[in-house]
């Protein structure tokens, strides 16, 4: 009884011309997601996913590495033009935006800050004492 060799078809990645880069920069990490114009996620990366641990995840260098990683994945989908949505006050925020603009073959069309701000909603948590 010889086993049959199972061959899988290679998954074809859809070609998307434009995309949106979501940069979520928290105090502890920087997460980047690339979507198509409809909002369907194509690829993502974060400082933690690249092996940075602890306080090193929130550094600008870790954010830069995460952007370079995710944009290399995004180029496989044929993305040439992107918009950027930035959220959060983290340390890797500015570096991540600059890195997206510096990547060859990617044109930044627009940039938007979508950080949620309360209009005096919920009471904030008590101040941290170190």
From Swiss-Prot:
The keyword Cytoplasm does not apply. The keyword rRNA-binding applies. Keywords: Ribonucleoprotein, Ribosomal protein, RNA-binding, rRNA-binding. GO terms for biological process: translation. Pfam families: Ribosomal_S11 (PF00411). GO terms for molecular function: rRNA binding; structural constituent of ribosome. One of its GO terms (cellular component) is ribonucleoprotein complex. Located on the platform of the 30S subunit, it bridges several disparate RNA helices of the 16S rRNA. Forms part of the Shine-Dalgarno cleft in the 70S ribosome. Belongs to the universal ribosomal protein uS11 family. Part of the 30S ribosomal subunit. Interacts with proteins S7 and S18. Binds to IF-3. This is Small ribosomal subunit protein uS11.
């Amino acid at each position: 009884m010889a086993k049959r060799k199972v061959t899988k078809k290679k998954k074809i990645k859809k070609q998307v011309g434009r995309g949106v880069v979501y940069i979520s920069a928290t105090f502890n990490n920087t997460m980047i997601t690339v979507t198509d114009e409809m909002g369907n996620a194509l690829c993502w990366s974060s400082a933690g996913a690249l092996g940075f641990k602890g306080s090193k995840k929130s550094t600008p260098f870790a954010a830069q590495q995460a952007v370079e990683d995710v944009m290399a994945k995004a180029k496989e989908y044929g993305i040439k033009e992107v918009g950027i949505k930035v959220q959060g006050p983290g340390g890797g925020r500015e570096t991540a935006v600059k890195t997206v603009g510096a990547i060859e073959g990617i044109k930044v069309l627009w940039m938007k800050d979508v950080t949620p701000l309360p209009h005096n909603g919920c009471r904030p948590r008590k101040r941290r004492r170190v």
